[in-house]
Amino acid sequence: MASAGVDLFLGKVVGSVWSTKKTDNLTNLRFLIINPINLKKDPLTDVVIVADVLGAGVGETVICAYGHAARQAIYPQNPNEVSIEAAVVGIVDRMDVDDTMLQEIID
């Protein structure tokens, strides 16, 4: 999925996860099912469960962070106190990809 050094990815919200029993530091967190997308906006086969405090909805494209960046986004006062590995850090309003540049990347 994400390669070493890659802390952000784009994804489409495809659902949510409800959990009544979880560790205390996850109380009041909402969880979404994200399908990562590539630059051509095609969905990949993996899904990622992410924490969300921004209120993203099903069908929206979101920017997600991994690791420390995700924990910092969810609990900036003390990011080491929350046991998450991925989080929504932005909801995409629009995404413009230059087709010429995209073709260079693909080739």
Where are these predicted regions, by residue range?
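N-terminal first-folded block
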Residues: 2-44
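OB-fold and OB-like single-stranded nucleic-acid-recognition modules
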Residues: 2-3, 10-14, 19, 52, ...
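Short, surface-exposed secondary-structure edge patches
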Residues: 23, 51-55
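C-terminal structural segments of small proteins and small subunits
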Residues: 71-107
